[in-house]
């Protein structure tokens, strides 16, 4: 990022037109192949051509948002359905940038349904909240019978390269995982204000500008798995992490970091360890991450 880019004001005037992006994706199993059979988009959200670096059984898809960032008044809606027996790996090519608010909230809603015996790897790049960004995020994952899923959400407060400390702004977030009968397995609702004392509190963000949650859901996600992960979680001045089984079938890894690169490396290591256990599928770093 150039000096001019890092200090540019990237909010839109209140009178500017807001974006509404909507994307629907549907995956089905045809023989041994997972196929993207449905795609519908409105506005700037798109999906790139599906790839099969692991063979026909696992479909890799990259979700792109061409404008590159989300401003006040913008709304993004993603509805994704994995049919029975499918396996999809979904990611994004870069960080989602949430710009300085123009007086309106920017919103994102993600709803993912994973069919019976299906497998999901939800591996997006991080959210980057500019100073004075106001955002509302909603994430729902529904798991069918004998389904499994691994995913994460990573956040950076302020553009560190530009010296931002996120001195103003607000993030409202809601995440929930539900089982095949619609019963909540895990739910979390948070409202983080730039001046919230929890940002500096030891029981909160402890002064770290980067944080995230990795979740794994499935029959193999039990207390023993969480304990094995917890034993190798780092805890130092640059990266702090812990693992817990919040309910039978759901394991969480919480992480604080001084940089997004450190958090991403940690989440990738966790995913590489978890995938063979949770999905019973070997794990290799995505090619996209290496470009």
Curated annotation (Swiss-Prot):
Xref: HAMAP family: UreD (MF_01384)
Record-given protein name: Urease accessory protein UreD
Cellular component terms per the entry's GO annotation: cytoplasm
Claim: Cytoplasm is one of the keywords in the record: yes
Organism for this UniProt entry: Burkholderia vietnamiensis (strain G4 / LMG 22486) (Burkholderia cepacia (strain R1808))
UniProt similarity note: Belongs to the UreD family.
GO MF terms, alphabetically ordered: nickel cation binding
Function: Required for maturation of urease via the functional incorporation of the urease nickel metallocenter.
């Amino acid at each position: 990022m150039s000096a001019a880019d890092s200090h540019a004001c990237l909010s839109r005037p209140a009178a500017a037109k807001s974006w509404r992006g909507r994307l629907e994706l549907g995956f089905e199993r045809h023989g041994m192949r997972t196929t993207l059979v449905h795609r519908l988009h409105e506005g700037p959200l798109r999906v790139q051509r599906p790839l099969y670096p692991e063979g026909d059984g696992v479909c890799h898809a990259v979700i792109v948002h061409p404008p590159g960032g989300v401003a006040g008044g913008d709304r993004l809606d993603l509805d994704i359905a994995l049919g029975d027996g499918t396996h999809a790996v979904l990611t994004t090519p870069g960080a989602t940038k949430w710009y300085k608010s123009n007086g309106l909230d920017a919103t994102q809603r993600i709803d993912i349904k994973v069919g019976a015996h299906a497998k999901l790897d939800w591996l997006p790049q991080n959210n980057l909240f500019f100073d004075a960004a106001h955002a509302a995020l909603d994430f729902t994952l529904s798991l069918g019978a004998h389904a499994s899923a691994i995913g994460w959400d990573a956040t950076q407060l302020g553009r560190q390269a530009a010296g931002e400390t996120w001195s103003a702004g607000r993030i409202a977030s809601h995440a929930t995982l539900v089982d095949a009968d619609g019963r909540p397995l895990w739910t979390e609702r948070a409202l983080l204000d730039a001046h919230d004392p929890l940002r500096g509190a030891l029981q909160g963000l402890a002064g770290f500008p980067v944080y995230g949650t990795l979740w794994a859901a499935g029959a193999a996600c039990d207390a023993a798995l969480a304990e094995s992960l917890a034993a190798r979680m780092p805890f130092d001045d640059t990266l702090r992490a812990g693992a817990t089984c919040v309910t039978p079938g759901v394991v969480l890894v919480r992480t604080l970091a001084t940089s997004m690169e450190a958090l991403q490396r940690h989440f990738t290591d966790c995913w590489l360890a978890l995938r063979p256990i949770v999905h019973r599928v070997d794990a290799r770093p995505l090619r996209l991450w290496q470009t």
